Amino acid sequence: MVLRWMISAVCLLVLCGCSNRIAEFDHTTLELEKATDFHEEVDQKMVDESTLVTEVINMPAFGGFGLFLFPSEASFYGEMTLDNIDALLPYHSHIDTDTTVEVINTLLELSESGETLFYDIYTDVEKEEDISKENTGMFFFKGEEGAPFAIISAGGGFAYVGSIHESLPHALELSKNGYNAFVLQYRTGGADMACEDLAMAISFVFENADMLGVSTEGYSLWGGSAGARMAAYLGSYGPAAFGGNSFPRPAAVIMQYTGHSDYTENDPPTYACVGENDGIANWHRMECRIRALDRLGIDTEFHHYPNLGHGFGLGIGTSAEGWIDDAIAFWERHME
């Protein structure tokens, strides 16, 4: 346990000290290229808990965006395997290896069947004008043709994006229920840039709905921790307030464990959940915001789970397990 916390602390210092992400990416790319030389036979085989993180990132199926499966701000992966990624996710807990493996294998199967796994949200010109936008985009888990969509943003304190634990598994579950789910890879460094990326993601889906095969009616925004702040801000003020186009605000916002307190009288219906032992997002504070929305006549649902801390994701094996089914049901009530 002490070793794990020491590793996490070192990881966090590395993350917080990042001032030049592009240089860092170049360093990581060199490491990954070496890994590719060592693991030549990585094509479309399935992964398991012993598969190296670098091997997954370099799989041809992921076409260069495999780095976004894991916190890409990390400057090292070494011999890290899929059953030992906790050090990459210092703000997260209860990381379930079986879920990690299922997510990656599902993406490999989708690639094998010809599905597009990742979409850019910025044009090449926009990326040239602001090179930080290179590190953005969305994974896509396709549901039923013409079904509503959700965009999920993982947390990480705006220092890293914990998608492998806090948004990719959620998207997989939503797609199993027939819904189209996008996982946002946003820029780290602060809420403003992250919200701009979410606004652009919403605009991208609306503008390409026919190509993507999704309905823009009754969409939802999901997020955990920092990602929940993003979902809440876009729910309160809409994409135009953050540089996107004037598209509707979501039909529902699904939030996990955040101390976000801002709200408006026009907020969408909001589902929220948190652990009672959360030392980052106090559950009483989260409840205060939900009760304020209640008083405004906004439909809400709030759950707090015993013996549970911050960053539990799907909460597999915890008192929160199954919360996502409640959240889906809440969203479904507000789709029309």
Give the ranges of each region predicted by the language model.
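Short beta-strand/loop motif that positions the catalytic acidic residue
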Residues: 272-274, 278
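C-terminal catalytic histidine-bearing segment of alpha/beta-hydrolase fold enzymes
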Residues: 22-26, 31-66, 296-336
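Catalytic nucleophile-loop/oxyanion-hole region of alpha/beta-hydrolase
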Residues: 162-164, 183-212, 316-320
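Short beta-strand element of the alpha/beta-hydrolase
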Residues: 147-156, 271
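Short alpha-helix in the alpha/beta-hydrolase fold that links the catalytic acid
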Residues: 268, 282-292
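Short amphipathic alpha-helix adjacent to the substrate-entry channel of hydrolases
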Residues: 163-182, 291
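Primarily recognizes the serine-hydrolase "nucleophile elbow" in alpha/beta-hydrolase
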Residues: 200-267
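N-terminal cap/lid segment of alpha/beta-hydrolase-fold proteins
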Residues: 60, 66-145, 191, 195, ...
